[in-house]
């Protein structure tokens, strides 16, 4: 028995929102200090959602809405992505997917970034940010004079885990490594 519920405004009209995958943070509805997002039919959405943080189609991140309460969630959790993969995510108190280093782990749009299996270590670049050396568990390598990946490439990092050298050669700029993996979206 699937039950759907609606939220009616003071004018008696149900609150509605955009198509999934097209929402912006201004589409959120706050009810009793809890954040909701509604679809065009007025039904609150749930699951991992791509939400635009500005009018630019390049500015978006992940929010996660609980299947039962339909509210925006915060903190660290394991979520099944659209392709069935279970991944670790971290959401800020605002519900926004965290980007950066948290508890010595690297996150992008809330998703934990890990080196590919069999590589030991991998350089992962956060778009608009820095490149980090990460192991297969998602932990960054800090203050390292040289950790080696499975191919023997040696990486050095600073106290923040940012890549400083590859095979002893200083690197400048931040565009090294593979780009961080986005969450796997519904739409």
Predicted features, each with a name:
Residues 1-187:
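Extracellular adhesion/carbohydrate-binding repeat motifs centered on closely spaced tryptophans
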